A protein has these predicted regions:
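Enzymes that bind and transform nitrogen-containing heteroaromatic metabolites
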Residues: 1-211
């Protein structure tokens, strides 16, 4: 089935973490944040998993550059989400993909203008395919967390991966890509690399090789 062009973007520590064991995740310099917001402004939808929505409580809006806000998408198979999250409290449209959701919560979210989409099974591909057909999403950005990123990588459901390396060692915490892993790894093609304007970070762009 057709799907959007999918970009994965994350900023990680030198040792491959997106957050510390205490949840600290402010790894991006101002230039990297602006770069992320520029990508947000160029896509139709930005996707996060339920854990990222709960822990980071992001707005996922475009604020540091000129541009329109994308549709915000939360993937939550259980539908267990706090209705006071920023994603449900500020415009624009937020869509929740779920298998089930408690009736009272669903009514409360719908009253806030949130769209609830039930799928029989939640997979990375099923979500972006539905975004393509239901909301005409042609370009989508996946921002995390690690398990959500892994689901897109495992299903080979992405086209581009952008990663910024921050000059920080965390030692433990949340991995950038978190899952059962591959036996032999998945190889991508490096298409560009650059030193960040801050002089301390490296930004890498890979494309998914279709063998």
């Amino acid at each position: 089935m057709p799907r959007p062009y999918v970009i994965i973007y994350f900023t990680e520590s030198i040792d491959g973490r997106i957050a510390s064991r205490t949840g600290y995740s402010k790894l991006s310099c101002p230039y990297d944040l602006k770069r992320l917001h520029l990508v947000r402004a160029q896509v139709d939808a930005v996707i996060v998993g339920a854990s990222t929505a709960r822990v980071d409580n992001p707005k996922l809006t475009v604020r540091l550059v000129e541009g329109r806000n994308p549709i915000r998408v939360v993937i939550s198979a259980s539908g267990n989400l706090n209705p006071s999250l920023n994603l449900f409290s500020v415009p624009p449209l937020t869509v929740v993909y779920t298998v089930s959701m408690e009736g009272g919560l669903e009514r409360e979210l719908k009253a806030k203008g949130v769209e609830i989409v039930r799928l029989s099974e939640i997979t990375a591909c099923s979500v972006v395919e539905d975004l393509y057909s239901r909301f005409s999403v042609k370009r989508a950005l996946v921002e995390g967390g690690g398990r959500t990123i892994w689901s897109f990588v495992r299903e080979d459901c992405f086209d581009e991966l952008r990663v910024t390396i921050s000059p920080v060692i965390l030692g433990s915490g949340r991995n950038s890509v978190e899952g059962e892993g591959f036996d032999e790894g998945k190889r991508l093609k490096l298409v560009s690399y650059s030193a960040c304007e801050c002089g301390q970070e490296i930004h890498l762009v890979y494309v998914n090789k279709k063998d």
